[in-house]
Amino acid sequence: NRPTYVPAPPRPPHPRL
């Protein structure tokens, strides 16, 4: 059986430097 895939939580966009 495949382990349950847990997607990573959405991250805030990186500021344009």
Curated annotation (Swiss-Prot):
Induction data: By bacterial infection.
Sorted UniProt keywords: Antibiotic, Antimicrobial, Immunity, Innate immunity, Secreted
Entry's localization field: Secreted
Domain of life: Eukaryota
One GO BP: defense response to Gram-negative bacterium
GO cellular component: extracellular space
Family membership noted in the UniProt record: Belongs to the apidaecin family.
Function: Antimicrobial peptide active against many Gram-negative enterobacterial and plant-associated bacterial species. Not active against other bacterial species like H.pylori, P.mirabilis, B.pertussis or N.gonorrhoeae.
Protein's UniProt name: Apidaecin A
Originating organism: Sphecius speciosus
